[in-house]
């Protein structure tokens, strides 16, 4: 039987019978050295084989787990709607909203609660309880525990800032003022105006000043495909705010779910209206939620349903227009505050030349001016850089909806 070619050759001892004892001793010593060397090679190969065996064992275990996963039937998501006292449960399957009465195992009967999210099999038996649904849906929400925007970062919105502080900051920081006067603070604040005028910055700055968590959600995220999903997300939004209070809820693009109702009978429009009804319901009970305030923003104030604007919901309507020349000068000074700007740059002249620019566009103007300076390998921003940036933004505005061409459509 031949040996593996990967094994080292076995050393052999050839001793001449006619050799002297000293020569025999030297031969034995050389043979011993050869044996030790071969043993080292064999030990190294053994270590490699054992390492490879361990890798193969891990691969086998992984494949076995994958095989078990492939053979395991998928589970469906459902919500517990009711828990009768006979050990059963009424569950509603997600997607088709089918309600089923199913028996619970003794292990789950004592721990399950109404509203829990569960996994069920094809026979509608509850297999396990899932994590809090609010956590699973938090990906649709932007939660900022401590916004970095301050009042100093906002320019040209002194009147709007004062109104927002009165309606949001004072009820959280100085509630005794309202108790002393005997009035209730506004239930909600609606910011309306063209895009890029600083509506989100206003909300973040107030959250920073009050040390409140900032929970932002776009209204379009509340528009869901399946029946009941949007309403459930609205409930999750307010439940998350309760967990993180003091908190400020900011709903951007609220017109996506609060547009004027029509006679349309399509399922999509009906679902949007159900979502709006859930939002109104949550706001009607808002005064019992403690240190939670709500702010919404829209670019299309003219599209909002009258129900969302009635007293007790959004009590304070604040228009955030494009900045005037003085406000534009202040905004430019803020955004260029950290830039190395040449002394020859006059922000008042720039403000006069940027009529109808929004705050966001002025921020882009400062950034683009800095980019032109970098392009010319300079560490100082000149007036010509701002002029080049202006021309660039205007040119982009001719082909995109983001240029300095916003109409004043807020009536």
Swiss-Prot record:
Residues 35-75 form a coiled coil. ATP binds at residues 196-201, 335. It is found in: Cytoplasm. InterPro entries: 26S_Proteasome_ATPase, AAA+_ATPase, AAA_lid_3, ATPase_AAA_core, ATPase_AAA_CS, NA-bd_OB-fold, Nucleotidase_PAN, P-loop_NTPase. The keyword Cell cycle does not apply. Its main location: cytoplasm. Gene3D superfamilies: 1.10.8.60, Nucleic acid-binding proteins, P-loop containing nucleotide triphosphate hydrolases. GO terms for biological process: proteasome-mediated ubiquitin-dependent protein catabolic process; protein unfolding. Residues 408-411 are annotated as: Docks into pockets in the proteasome alpha-ring to cause gate opening. NCBIfam families: PRK03992.1, PrtsmActNtasePan2. Consists of three main regions, an N-terminal coiled-coil domain that may assist in substrate recognition, an interdomain involved in PAN hexamerization, and a C-terminal ATPase domain of the AAA type. ATPase which is responsible for recognizing, binding, unfolding and translocation of substrate proteins into the archaeal 20S proteasome core particle. Is essential for opening the gate of the 20S proteasome via an interaction with its C-terminus, thereby allowing substrate entry and access to the site of proteolysis. Thus, the C-termini of the proteasomal ATPase function like a 'key in a lock' to induce gate opening and therefore regulate proteolysis. HAMAP family: PAN. Homohexamer. The hexameric complex has a two-ring architecture resembling a top hat that caps the 20S proteasome core at one or both ends. Upon ATP-binding, the C-terminus of PAN interacts with the alpha-rings of the proteasome core by binding to the intersubunit pockets. This is Proteasome-activating nucleotidase 2. It comes from Halobacterium salinarum (strain ATCC 700922 / JCM 11081 / NRC-1) (Halobacterium halobium). The lineage of its organism: Archaea, Methanobacteriati, Methanobacteriota, Stenosarchaea group, Halobacteria. The gene is pan2.
């Amino acid at each position: 039987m031949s040996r593996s070619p990967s094994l080292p050759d076995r050393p052999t001892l050839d001793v001449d019978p006619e050799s002297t004892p000293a020569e025999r001793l030297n031969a034995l010593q050389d043979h011993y050295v050869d044996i030790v060397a071969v043993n080292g090679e064999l030990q190294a190969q053994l270590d490699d084989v054992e390492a490879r065996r361990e890798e193969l064992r891990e691969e086998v275990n992984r494949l076995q787990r994958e095989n078990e996963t492939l053979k395991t039937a998928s589970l469906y998501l459902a919500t517990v709607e009711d828990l009768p006292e006979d050990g059963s449960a009424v569950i509603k399957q997600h997607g088709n909203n089918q309600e089923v009465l199913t028996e619970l195992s003794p292990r789950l009967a004592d721990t399950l609660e109404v509203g829990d999210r569960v996994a069920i099999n094809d026979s509608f038996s509850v297999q396990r309880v899932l994590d809090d649904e609010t956590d699973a849906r938090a990906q649709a929400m932007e939660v900022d525990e401590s916004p970095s925007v301050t009042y100093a970062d906002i320019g040209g919105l002194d009147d709007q800032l004062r109104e927002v502080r009165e309606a949001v900051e004072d009820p959280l920081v100085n509630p005794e003022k309202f108790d002393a006067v005997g009035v209730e603070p506004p239930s909600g604040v609606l910011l309306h105006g063209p895009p890029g005028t600083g509506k989100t910055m206003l909300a973040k700055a107030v959250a920073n000043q009050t040390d409140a968590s900032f929970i932002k959600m776009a209204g379009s995220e509340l528009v869901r495909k399946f029946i009941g999903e949007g309403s459930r997300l609205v409930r999750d939004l307010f439940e998350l705010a309760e967990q993180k209070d003091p908190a400020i809820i900011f709903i951007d693009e609220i017109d996506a779910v609060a547009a004027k109702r029509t006679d349309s009978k399509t399922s999509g429009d009906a679902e949007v209206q159900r979502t709006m009804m859930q939002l109104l319901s949550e706001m009607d009970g808002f005064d019992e939620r403690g240190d939670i305030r709500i702010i919404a923003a829209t670019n299309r104030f003219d599209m909002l349903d009258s129900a969302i604007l009635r007293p007790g919901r959004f009590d304070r309507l604040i228009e955030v227009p494009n900045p005037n020349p003085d406000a534009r000068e202040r905004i430019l000074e803020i955004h260029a505050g950290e830039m190395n700007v040449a002394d020859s740059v006059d922000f008042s002249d720039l403000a006069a030349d940027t009529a109808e620019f929004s705050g966001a566009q002025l921020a882009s103007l400062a950034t683009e001016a800095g980019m032109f300076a970098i392009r010319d390998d300079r560490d100082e921003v000149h007036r010509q850089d701002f002029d080049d940036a202006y021309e660039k933004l205007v040119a982009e505005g001719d082909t995109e909806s983001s240029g300095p061409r916003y109409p004043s459509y807020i009536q």
